[in-house]
């Protein structure tokens, strides 16, 4: 059993992936070991770093018994974490970091520390959207991206076809704007064939009425899930209204923090598939609690993981630790050098994530330096 942990140092490293994407990592040390955690949070990543610097100043003089004690040690209330994503990301980082450091103290891998049995691999689904963030978002481009993912061995593919919709529009205008998105999904379905499952992420573009119409169109294409037609952190009641009236399971929750948030969504019928993100939900151990709770209440879990290889490894460990977990998300074709920034390199083959020895990896700073990045405090 690991002793109480005291964080003694913190440093950061970021890498530019595309014009729209930067991955940022934090390294926490207790003086004898280090733990690498991804803190990518879009335009709020700078605030996450500031929150972490402030928090570590406190934790350097305070021993923490477990990751569950972090928020209390910092005097942070759950309401703050549920309403401030950058703060939730910082606290999630600290909680994941302490879980990892204590696993190292105990001489066990992270999967075991999370209550699971070590595995060779876990199944993935391909998120093709990260490779389609530029200007070429024609149905043909979606079809080619889906076909490429299927050729790489993925039998589940997710797309986000509605990203050019303004969610503030009227229902009529939302439905008009959704037509091209539905055409994109149809193109993916046609390209990959009936034996590949297709998932759709709506990125909270719709209102209640437009959600129901779009769901009906997508049902005709045989999609596997309907992800966040409405933002669950903003309108869980509206999402529950939709979920109770569509034929496919509703998934979501990627921005939520804490087991209580997800349990409420499941209990009110807003989602059937919980999608915690280890970067935001409270960390790896909290993600396991969220997933096990969902499975026990006739729901399912699929970890949200559209970012870099550091959070991918952590998310794979969580997936491996939860019996009955669904396939894990993997963003395909965003950067050709993605796997090389870890040592050992990330291994994705035949639609599966293959664990490195000990289910752990470090940043390859030689490769990182080739992209003009280095550690900063």
Protein language model features and the residues they cover:
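Metal- or metallocofactor-binding catalytic centers and their adjacent structured scaffolds
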Residues: 33-108
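Hydrophobic faces of well-ordered beta-strands that scaffold small-molecule active sites
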Residues: 37, 122-126, 155-159, 198-202, ...
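Metal-dependent enolase-superfamily TIM-barrel catalytic cores that perform enediolate-based chemistry
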Residues: 121, 125-239, 245
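Shared catalytic-loop signature of beta/alpha-barrel
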Residues: 69, 216, 222, 231-252, ...
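Conserved, mostly hydrophobic/aromatic
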Residues: 32, 94, 107, 157, ...
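Glycine-rich phosphate/pyrophosphate-binding beta-alpha loops
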Residues: 17, 38-46, 127-133
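Glycine-rich, aromatic-flanked loop segments that form ligand/cofactor-binding clefts
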Residues: 89, 94-135
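Structured beta-strand/loop patches that form or line metal/cofactor-binding pockets in enzymes
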Residues: 2-41, 337-339
